[in-house]
């Protein structure tokens, strides 16, 4: 049996409109909260190389900076370019005070000979420590060396995994599940 709009009780129509508005509000909250969560932090471990062609076989990139004041700004403003062909590693040189405050950070592409002197060296005259580390792999020099445990010559191959598209598909499906019963 079909009802004319005048045959429906007003409270049923208002309840139906309220349910639709509530469903739309829930979907919008989910969408906005998920977008905010993704944009909240910069994760330097998740950096993936671009899909542009490499200049030569086994090309790689390192975070690069010269005398930066802190690690965050070094990584954030690092120049995005391929390392020269005569280099194989990423070198990090970290100068810091006896209280652990960074005074200078240098990161660059390096040859094997530049990586022979890894470790930490304390200068009694200036009360500063210099720690040097080298690593092998695409953008492997995220962290700073701060002691003999991490001021090493490490061979670390970055994992190349493709990102999942699940969050993209999840939201439209969720929206459809909420809205479909209300129609």
Curated annotation (Swiss-Prot):
Subcellular location: Cell membrane
Membrane topology: Lipid-anchor; GPI-anchor
GO MF term (any one): acetylcholine receptor regulator activity
Pfam families xrefs: UPAR_LY6_2 (PF16975)
Keywords per UniProt: Cell membrane, Disulfide bond, Glycoprotein, GPI-anchor, Lipoprotein, Membrane, Signal
A GO cellular component entry from the record: extracellular region
Cysteines engaged in disulfide bonds, as pairs: 62-90, 65-74, 83-109, 115-134, 120-131, 135-140
Domain of life assignment: Eukaryota
Positions of the propeptide removed during maturation: 165-183
Region named Sufficient for inhibiting alpha-7 nAChR currents: 60-154
Start and end residues of each UPAR/Ly6 domain: 60-151
Signal peptide annotation: 1-39
TM segment ranges: none
Residues linked to a lipid group, GPI-anchor amidated serine type: 164
Lipoprotein recorded as keyword: yes
Physiological role: Likely acts as a modulator of nicotinic acetylcholine receptors (nAChRs) activity. In vitro acts on nAChRs in a subtype- and stoichiometry-dependent manner. However, according to another report in vitro it can weakly inhibits alpha-7 nAChRs.
Xref: PANTHER family: LY6/PLAUR DOMAIN-CONTAINING PROTEIN 6 (PTHR31171), LY6_PLAUR DOMAIN-CONTAINING PROTEIN 6B (PTHR31171:SF3)
Record protein name field: Ly6/PLAUR domain-containing protein 6B
Organism expressing this protein natively: Homo sapiens
Lineage, uppermost ranks: Eukaryota, Metazoa, Chordata, Craniata, Vertebrata
Gene (UniProt): LYPD6B
